[in-house]
Amino acid sequence: MASPFALLMVLVVLSCKSSCSLGCDLPETHSLDNRRTLMLLAQMSRISPSSCLMDRHDFGFPQEEFDGNQFQKAPAISVLHELIQQIFNLFTTKDSSAAWDEDLLDKFCTELYQQLNDLEACVMQEERVGETPLMNADSILAVKKYFRRITLYLTEKKYSPCAWEVVRAEIMRSLSLSTNLQERLRRKE
């Protein structure tokens, strides 16, 4: 029979693992995937951004949701997952496929899909550990509203090449901010 001290130590380690640990291990390649995604999105540009200055628009990116200092990892991962999911949804539409080079778009969407799988596995891992709340509903709603504004803008601009270029630049910015958040979270580990 194990000593009471040994059992106590096992219980402390297990409880600390579920409550003290961030519980989620993104693959080491995840940061590289983020950078590759940004590079692909940069390559997708078809027209000069300077020719679309009149079409610029403030979509109201929910910056506070990506601050990182206010977040614990589990809710942050859920918000990142929602961001990537919304980007994936935006770039897999019929209107999107008409706007971009098909090969680059396929590679970009494949990278997004891989990131979604990584983040999904992370969210599932958090659920198994029993982390709550897994999702910050207000933050997720802010991300959804942000993408709703982007979609409305594209519709109003009739999915013009300049509208897509403005959206591409906006998504580059949001992906860059999400990459920064992920790196801050990784450093906290």
From Swiss-Prot:
The gene is IFNA1. It comes from Homo sapiens (Human). Transmembrane segments: none annotated. SMART domains: IFabd (SM00076). Interacts with CR2. Interferons alpha-1 and alpha-13 have identical protein sequences. It holds the Pfam family Interferon. It is found in: Secreted. Belongs to the alpha/beta interferon family. This is Interferon alpha-1/13. Produced by macrophages, IFN-alpha have antiviral activities. Interferon stimulates the production of two enzymes: a protein kinase and an oligoadenylate synthetase. One of its GO terms (biological process) is B cell activation involved in immune response. CDD domains: IFab (cd00095). Disulfide bonds join C24-C122, C52-C162.
